[in-house]
Amino acid sequence: VTQFSAASHATAFLIWDFPGFLPGSHSPGIHISRPDTMAIARRRGVIGHVGQFFDDEITRIDGVLVTTRTRTWLDCARKMSIDELTVVADHLLRHPRPAFESRTEPYASPAQLAEMLDRHKGTPGIRKARLALEQARIGADSAPETRLRLALCRAGLPEPELNVGAVLRNGVVRQPDLAYSEHQVAVEYEGAGHSEAAQVIRDIAREEDFSGAGWILVRISKRHMENDARAAVAKVSAALASRGWQPN
């Protein structure tokens, strides 16, 4: 790519509606990137950047040039924490549910994210991006699920399975957010939508299915994720311990 001006960094982060926390993402100003063969964009309300770009790192949305999802993930690495970069990576790697979404393929593969890192080895924040890719997993449906998984693993708990179907009694299949099938422990993160009346009924039925099949269902909310998810870790750890798991 030789001549262009494209929305990038925090602006592209918002355009792509990425999950995760990017410091300053809502600050005034539009981030514009150009190839390093051009002068940096300098005008009121514009935050200019220059860099090396490959043809497949720029796309067009409603007539506006914007850095691709994978390139945007890398460009934001300098300001984001490793865990929040992992949140975005999980989002990009997630396999969609065709019955509920307008796509059938993930936004990126692990190989595509790795290739992006290999292309731009001197990019600020690339070390954090590499660590984020190492701890990214396919299967998380939301940012809280990723943060919960990371907190559990960091606390020394076994790594859970992500959104894997569990066959319960009478052939009923449930797909918990996180699971320890070996110990018959399921973990669900319940966001604000779980307070709605219809969802409460579904949640009760779900819990009955798990308990009837001998599983423990651990229900986690935003409150449990405070203070580095200590309460969430304690709940899951207690459930695993009751099934014979012991920390190393």
Put a short name on every predicted segment.
Residues 1-125, 246-248:
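Short gly/ser-rich loop at a beta-strand->alpha-helix junction or flexible surface loop bordering the NTP-binding
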Residues 96-248:
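Surface segments flanking catalytic/ligand-binding clefts of nucleic-acid enzymes
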